[in-house]
């Protein structure tokens, strides 16, 4: 039985032995139940630059006119941000995300997709990795966004108590497992814990060339945000349409 504790501060391990008795025999056989938990000495704080706001600005509704292309979604383009995590002591962590607007995601497919997403510049045609952008005044879903960690140009920086360390981005699809399986990240795509069926996507860092999370005191993740929305024939043109995406980014302790 495995328990994970978030924002924890000490370490404990206790074991409880339970004997099994037979009413008909004098001999006995035993089994053990072990209760474990970990309270890490380091507490970590995540901060997204710009107060956590990604602002696509104010525009006239005509910017949402139909595209006239095979891809029906209007592309809003790319925004950059940075996730900084600092810890009071070297700590093993994973980063997860939760979409608080999941019910407003516009379904993505071959004719409605986010163009050139992530650091791989791939067309994102799968809904499971998408994040919602809220609803228009007429009740229609506004659009979808992708969020990814930028692995290019050495943008990920990490340090432990000895100083900066070279790292690679690694990921697991089951971060809360007793022993998560880690692999090199293919595109750094965030996958919401609320919309990725049977997947608990988590990101961490490993020393360059390795696949085991390394304890860090600080790490910087450059973020890439790409968004696309329905056109104004769907969202309407008589009222103000406000993007309302909201994502919780969490530090999980390993």
Swiss-Prot record:
Keyword Transcription part of the UniProt annotation: no
Keyword hit for Chloroplast: no
Signal peptide (UniProt feature, chain positions): 1-25
Membrane topology: Single-pass membrane protein
Gene Ontology CC: one annotated term: plasma membrane
Induction comment from the UniProt entry of this chain: Repressed by H-NS, induced by LeuO. A monocistronic operon.
Transmembrane segment boundaries: 213-229
Alphabetized Pfam families for the sequence: DUF1120 (PF06551)
Cell location: Cell membrane
Entry keywords, A to Z: Cell membrane, Membrane, Signal, Transmembrane, Transmembrane helix
Top-rank taxon: Bacteria
Function according to Swiss-Prot or TrEMBL: Involved in induction of the so-called NTR enzymes in response to nitrogen deprivation, as well as in glutamate biosynthesis. May mediate the glutamate-dependent repression of the GLT operon.
Family: To E.coli YhcF.
Descriptive protein name: Protein GltF
Species: Escherichia coli (strain K12)
């Amino acid at each position: 039985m495995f328990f994970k504790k978030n924002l924890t501060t000490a370490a404990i391990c206790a074991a409880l032995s339970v004997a099994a008795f037979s009413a008909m025999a004098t001999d006995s056989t035993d089994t053990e139940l072990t209760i474990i938990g970990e309270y890490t000495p380091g507490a970590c704080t995540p901060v997204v630059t710009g107060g956590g706001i990604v602002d696509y600005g104010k525009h006239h509704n005509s910017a949402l006119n139909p595209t006239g292309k095979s891809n029906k979604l209007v592309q809003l383009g790319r925004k950059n941000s940075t996730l900084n995590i600092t810890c009071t002591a070297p700590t093993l962590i994973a980063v997860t995300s939760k979409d608080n607007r999941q019910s407003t995601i516009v379904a993505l497919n071959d004719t409605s997709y986010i163009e050139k997403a992530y650091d791989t510049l791939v067309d994102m045609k799968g809904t499971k990795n998408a994040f919602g952008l809220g609803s228009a005044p007429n009740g229609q879903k506004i659009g979808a966004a992708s969020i990814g960690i930028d692995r290019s140009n050495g943008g990920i920086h990490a340090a432990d108590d000895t100083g900066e360390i070279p790292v690679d981005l690694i990921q697991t699809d089951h971060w809360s497992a007793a022993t998560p399986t880690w692999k090199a990240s293919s595109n750094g795509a965030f996958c919401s814990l609320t919309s990725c069926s049977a997947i608990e996507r988590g990101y961490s860092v490993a020393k360059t060339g390795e696949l085991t999370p390394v304890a860090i005191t600080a790490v910087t993740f450059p973020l890439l945000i790409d968004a696309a929305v329905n056109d104004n024939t769907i969202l309407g043109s008589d009222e103000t349409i406000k993007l309302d995406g909201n994502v919780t980014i969490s530090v999980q302790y390993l």
